[in-house]
Amino acid sequence: MRFSIRAIGKIKEKWMREGIEEYSKRLKPVVKVDVLESDEEKMPENPSAAVKGKVLEKEGEKLLRSIQDSGCVVLLDMNGKKVSSEELAAWIAQKTVMGTSHFYFMIGGPYGNGKNIQARADLKLSMGPMTFTHQMARLILFEQLYRAVKINHHEPCLLYTSPSPRDMRRS
């Protein structure tokens, strides 16, 4: 299985990068993980709806160019489906059983997602009613992917200790 994270914008805070690296390290014994960051497009001050739409389409094009047609695309979107950790784990397991091995998790920039990337999404996923920065959303996504893998392997999700690679292997 492979999780490819595609994101607009870079993680600037060291503590967020370290958190993402930690969850990535925890996932790697059982899942291939890669991240590709694309630069945000410049948004003018007080943009019209048309200008904002064009900027979002450009960012969407950047994300779409980085994926293969055969992968399953999950778009983080505030209007997406709200699921529990267990439901996300079950969805990933179901897609895997149906033959999906590559999941693309797409995170737009601070202004949202263009219609082009929304149209390509196999699942639009919401992190709930609260709003997070796109940087924080990435950290939370990594934690939830780690949790989903642990749930699907019927293993406890140890939050405050670093598991050894042995802890991540299938039983």
Predicted stretch roles:
Residues 11, 78-81, 109-112:
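Short glycine-rich anion-binding loops that position phosphate/pyrophosphate groups of nucleotides
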Residues 14, 21-24, 33, 45, ...:
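Short Lys/Arg-rich amphipathic alpha-helical segments
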Residues 29-42:
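A short beta-strand-loop structural module common to alpha/beta enzyme folds
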Residues 31, 70-71, 121:
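Short, well-ordered alpha-helix to beta-strand connector turns
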Residues 39-103:
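S-adenosyl-L-methionine/SAH cofactor-binding core of RNA-modifying enzymes
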Residues 111, 115-159:
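Structured adenosyl-cofactor binding patch, chiefly the S-adenosyl-L-methionine
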Residues 160-171:
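Single conserved hydrophobic/aromatic residue that forms the stacking wall/gate
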